[in-house]
Amino acid sequence: MIIGKKPCSVCGEAGDGAHFGAEACRACAAFFRRSVALNKAYVCRAMGACIIQKNVRCMCRACRFSKCMSVGMRKSAVQRHRELFGRQDSSDGSNPRVSPSTSWPMDVSPVNIEEPGMATLNCLNENYTHMSNVRRVIHNTGSGNIFNPREPKAVAYTDAHSVHLKEIGLVADWIIKSYPDFQKVHQEQKKLLYRNFFLPFMILECGYHCCLNDRTDILFLPSGDFIDCSRPETFYGSHINSHLMSPEEAIRMFVPSFEIYRRNVLDPMRREKVDNYEFFTLCSLVLWDHGLEGQIDECVNMARHNRERILREILYYYRRVKQIPDPSMRLANLLVLLPALQRSVRRFQEDVEITHVFNVYSVEETFYELVSGRLSDGFFQKATQLDATPEEMKEIKKEVECVWDLNTSQVVDLYDLPPTSFLTPTSSTPSSTEM
């Protein structure tokens, strides 16, 4: 009697026998062997709750590897197999491998879902990965390899505004590449949508990184540095250059804003454990807003079409991938975040306006205009050109193309890169600001 092979204990596909201590298919066995042999360190963007099945097994490598371990696969079996072919350099004392605990910039597993129900969300995810790698170069103010680990630092307002100024064009590039319909919109309508989007995105992304790192006492910046909310003097301090307001008065006036951001955005996102696809959904709903002053009917209709599409995709994600028992309630809890986000945006706008009126500290004109609802006429002619010197552009080309195939617009195995170059500040890390 012929006995059929058992299914893979990781993904449920037809098995190929016992591998490393558990029943597994060839794909999962090869994945486990490669992960252990190359000492891979994966990070899940969905709080370790991804479903691993044969049609979505490649979606999250972190959860796939965790499941390999939970079903009984042994790292030691891979190690013994490797030693048959030559002893590895096991000198732990020399050149230790740094394992960063932060989730930013994120090492993202390329999405490979066979069912075509999340086209826009997948596109956003891939382009966000690309943007994260470009950020490593754009915001690299030091010397040496951009993938070498560096300790994040608490920054002052001048550094934070410099980061956000670089982000204006970079985020616009992400939007243009991710939404084909955005290119079809009239120039003035593009500016209208984007200036309504950038500040909410900036705050949303900060909440998303706080959610990933499970802490809300600091505000993560796209550069990998942070604003230390518990020590506002590192952000304002003695750098206030105003005759109308002392540094102490500035701290008393603006520190309550940190509490507003935390209460309205950071804590709710952390409580709901918002993952990457939910973050992209919120971004999409903010971008494709309607009822804006000056918005024409054609733009309104296109915005409605894109909102409906992204809502269908997130519901598909809830039902088919996450397999949430009550997708409607989960989506409702997600949408409740949007009014609170707008309260934080208004507070940020008020703070910037106060600093401008009282000349508390200088704000770059481009950033102030965006906060005030203005963009230059030629913004989208130059937005896709990254704000970088020719030398930086060469570095971007050298470092980024190794993980992004410009011909196919697909991620090329990000996990062949060294570990991410940023470390999460710990409670014991002194919050020093480099000036």
From Swiss-Prot:
Compositional bias annotation for Polar residues: 91-104
Cited InterPro entries: HNF4-like_DBD, NHR-like_dom_sf, Nucl_hrmn_rcpt_lig-bd, Znf_hrmn_rcpt, Znf_NHR/GATA
GO cellular component: nucleus
One BP term from GO: regulation of transcription by RNA polymerase II
Domain called NR LBD: residue spans: 113-374
Subcellular location, record wording: Nucleus
Molecular function terms, GO-annotated: DNA-binding transcription factor activity; RNA polymerase II cis-regulatory region sequence-specific DNA binding; zinc ion binding
Pfam family, one: Hormone_recep
Family: Belongs to the nuclear hormone receptor family.
The protein's name in its UniProt record: Nuclear hormone receptor family member nhr-28
Organism: Caenorhabditis briggsae
The encoding gene: nhr-28
